[in-house]
């Protein structure tokens, strides 16, 4: 059973996926019901975080075995009382995997609420804390140090600074507020920094904020795979025509030994 509501897309994306999963060839091969089941299964999986957090090791600075040991020690500091393994990828020698634990369905929900935007919500599900720019609204009397329940406004309908929100929201877990409501919404200038320190997330995934920054790069698995498929060699010239914050360019440089 899905823990979160089914993901919703922009019209163009929905139309494309419908054509892919409900085309005549697929329905002929699988049958109408099986094709629909696969489509709904995709939507359910996309509503939840991946089963593993993937990190790429900077093999120029240290061995994978050494970084694996350091990372395990860092994760144990975050997850006191839990033994979360750090695994080596069976095919990609520079990748470490950390299993994501969840969803944790029995977390208590507190009266004080904090609503965050959808993008911030996605980051929280992947192990991030809540930073001030992601906060959309809070309950009326939230103070620094309060226990709060954090929710994502998945439809983008909550008004900034609202004291209550009865729209569609998804529970992300519990945290401790680092600031009061007035500090968040009545500041004379833009605020940065930590807003809510998550202590009981629905999905338990390590935070990589300042965790071994010179040794690790938090990177989604598909972005890693493409560099290995390319198999760049030292001395070659590589033109990256899709250079975005996915880490592919630096990975290519690492595989080429910066040559």
Residue ranges and their predicted role:
Residues 1-259:
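SAM-dependent transferase fold signal centered on methyltransferase-like domains
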């Amino acid at each position: 059973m899905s823990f979160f509501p089914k993901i919703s897309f922009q019209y163009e994306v929905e139309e494309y996926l419908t054509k892919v999963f409900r085309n005549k060839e697929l329905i002929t091969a699988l049958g109408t019901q099986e094709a629909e089941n696969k489509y709904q299964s995709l939507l359910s999986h996309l509503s939840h975080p991946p089963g593993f957090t993937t990190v790429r090791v900077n093999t120029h600075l240290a061995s994978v075995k050494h970084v694996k040991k350091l990372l395990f020690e860092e994760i144990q500091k975050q997850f006191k009382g839990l033994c979360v393994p750090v695994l080596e990828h069976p095919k990609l020698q520079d990748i470490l995997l950390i299993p994501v634990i969840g969803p944790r369905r029995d977390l208590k929900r507190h009266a004080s609420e904090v609503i965050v935007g959808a993008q911030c919500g996605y980051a929280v599900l992947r192990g991030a804390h809540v930073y001030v720019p992601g906060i959309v609204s809070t309950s009326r009397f939230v103070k620094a140090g309060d226990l709060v329940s954090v929710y994502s406004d998945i439809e983008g309908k909550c008004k900034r600074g609202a004291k209550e929100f009865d729209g569609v929201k998804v529970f992300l877990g519990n945290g401790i507020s680092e600031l009061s409501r007035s500090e968040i919404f009545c500041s004379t200038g833009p605020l940065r920094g930590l807003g809510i320190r998550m202590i009981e997330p629905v999905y338990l995934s390590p935070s990589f904020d300042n965790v071994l920054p010179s040794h690790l790069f938090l990177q989604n698995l598909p972005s890693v795979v493409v560099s290995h498929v390319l198999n760049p060699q030292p001395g070659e010239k590589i033109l990256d025509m899709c250079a975005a914050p996915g880490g592919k360019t630096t990975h290519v440089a690492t595989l080429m030994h910066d040559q």
